[in-house]
């Protein structure tokens, strides 16, 4: 009986310590950057310009009009990137976001667009009948999201181990 009570107290103490550590680490972007795998804890102004410029260069090649940066999409992307549920055990899309498209990458912001652009060959091979329900969509869907002509805005966020970009 005593060992059960002692174990319970230790478990509570350990949990409290871990939660307090999480609050400290979550207190600001630099705190995450110190313990990350070298990925930024948020999208810097330079990253923002590069993400937008690189995306628009790809869109231009596909005949799609340029898109603009949207702070609302960026804020939502940052919130999802900061949520441990977005990348614990693998990348997971925000099922609550249904106002456009969402791309996710375990690469940093400076590499994400080129990673998604690398799907162009699979996109071209899919032909003119793109079916987002087809299992092959995962091989070209990020590229497709970037070049959709009906999307006019984008915003991105980043945290330790994940970059999220949303398009609407």
Segment roles from a protein language model:
Residues 97-168:
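A well-ordered secondary-structure block
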Residues 1-34:
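Secretory targeting and sorting signals
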Residues 5-7, 56, 117:
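Short alpha-helical segments used as structural interaction elements across diverse proteins
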Residues 39, 43-100:
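Short, well-ordered surface patches within globular domains
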Residues 27, 71, 158:
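Glycine-rich, histidine-containing beta strand-loop boundary motifs that form or position
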